[in-house]
Amino acid sequence: MKRKSVVLITIVLGIALFLTGCGSKSTSSEDPLADGVLTAGTNDMYLPLEFRDENNELVGFDIDLGKALAEQLGVKIQWVPTAWDGIFNGLNAKQYDIVLSGTSITEERLTGFNMTDPYLANGIVIVSRKDATPAKTPKDLAGKTVGVQIETTADYAAEALKTQENVEYTVNKYDAMLDAFAALEGKQIDNIMTDISVAQFYTTLKPDVYAVSSDVLSNEPIGITVRKADTAFNEQLNTALDALRENGKLTELSMKWFGQDVTQNIDTNLKVIE
C-alpha cells in the first residue's frame, strides 16, 4: 500500500472517531457520574413538571427534583432540552445520563430501559371545557376531537380506547400540552387526555375554562429513565430518591407545585391503557 494511501486512511479514521464522539457524554469510567455531572434529558414544554418561565429559565417540579437529586449525589446537574419524540433515542445515544421528564413507568418502557422506583403518582384523565358538557367516560367522547401530546401514554390510550370502548372520535396530536390546552380553550378541540398532574395544574390556572371531567383512567406512576445496562446507576438513583423522600424534600416540592403530596405511598401496580 502506498504511503499516501495510508496517510489518507489514517486521516479518515481519525475524523470518523472524532465524529463518533460528538454529541455524546463520555467518561473514562462506566460510572455516568464519574465526571461529577448528572446530565438529564428533559422536554421543556410540559407544565408544571418542566417548562420555561418568563426569563426563559427552566423551572418545574422535575427541575427542582433534578437539582435536589444532584445535591444528594454530590454532583452538578446539566439539563439537555430535547423534543419528547426523540428523548429516548438520545438516552441510548448517551447524549445524557437520564431522562427526567414526567415519564410514566410502563411495561413496554421497562423492556428497553431501566426505570427508578416511582417518585410521583400519576394516571390519565379527560379534561373538558367548563362551558361544555363534561366527558365523564371515554364513551362520552363519541364524535368529538380529543387533544393529546404526541408519543405519550395519553396518546396511546386515546387510540387504544377507541377499540376497547367501541367509540369513534378524532385524536389531534400536539408537540406540547401547552398547545393542546390553547386549542381546547379556543374551541378547536373538544377534550384533552393527559396526566392528572398536568390536568390539575391547568384547571387550577384557569378554573373558569378547564375541568377534570373523568375519574383517573389508568395507573402509571412517574419515574426516572436510565439505559438498560446502567443497573448499578439505577439503584444509586433509587437510594438518592429514598433519601429525598425520607427527609421531606419530595413532599416539599410536591406541595410547591401541586398543592398536595403525591409522592408518598404510590401504587406501583401498573394499569396502562395500550
Where are these predicted regions, by residue range?
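C-terminal motif of bacterial Sec signal peptides marking the signal peptidase cleavage site
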Residues: F18-G21
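Ligand-binding clefts/hinges and TM-proximal coupling segments of bilobed small-molecule sensing domains
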Residues: S24-S28, T153-V171, A211-V212, D242-E274
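Extracytoplasmic small-molecule ligand-binding "clamshell" domains
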Residues: T27-G102, Q236
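Periplasmic-binding protein-like
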Residues: D44, A121-S128, I196, Q200-T239, ...
